[in-house]
Amino acid sequence: EWLDPEKEKKSAYGFGLSFDQKVHDAVTLFARYGWQDPKVYNPDITASGDLNYSLKHSWSAGLQVEGKPWRRENDVLGLAVGQVIPSQDYRRSFDPELACKDEGHLEAYYSMHINDHLSISPDFQYIWNPFGKDISDDTDDIFIYGLRTQVDF
């Protein structure tokens, strides 16, 4: 069962790990892992219409390639994949026929160094089983296209 913040005065806790390793002059691999006490979420106290998601684990892994091989030393290509894994309490709290699944994501970006003050990064993200497909069984996968801009003064 989830903690009731009106009655329980227990602390929430979790931890995260992050590893980055340069394996070549231009290639860095990374891995991330996080865990939280899944009892910190209580669907009975969330605002109406909020789409909260009680997670227990999350992980991601990927690589980053600097632009040296194609003579753009300050550019960076990044690829990542990961999952968020809901708690068992969360899985049991919804219609069992929906069979809440793990949510996954894939991301790719390319950071273009324009000059010493400006970088532009087109970004693509693909999310499957959004919210574990627990809201309705026909939840579509999500495609996100973005453009990040970094301005340094």
Predicted stretch roles:
Residues 1-19:
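Surface-exposed beta-loop-beta
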Residues 13-17, 33, 57-63, 104-108, ...:
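Hydrophobic, lipid-facing positions within transmembrane beta-strands of outer-membrane proteins
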Residues 15, 29, 33-35, 61, ...:
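Transmembrane beta-barrel strands of outer-membrane/channel proteins
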Residues 20, 64-68, 109-111, 150-152:
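Transmembrane beta-barrel domains of outer membrane proteins
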Residues 22-26, 67-78, 114-120:
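Short loop/turn motifs that connect adjacent beta-strands in outer-membrane beta-barrel proteins
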Residues 35-39, 65-67, 81-87, 126-130, ...:
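Transmembrane beta-strands of outer-membrane beta-barrel pores
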Residues 79, 139-153:
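Outer-membrane beta-barrel "beta-signal"
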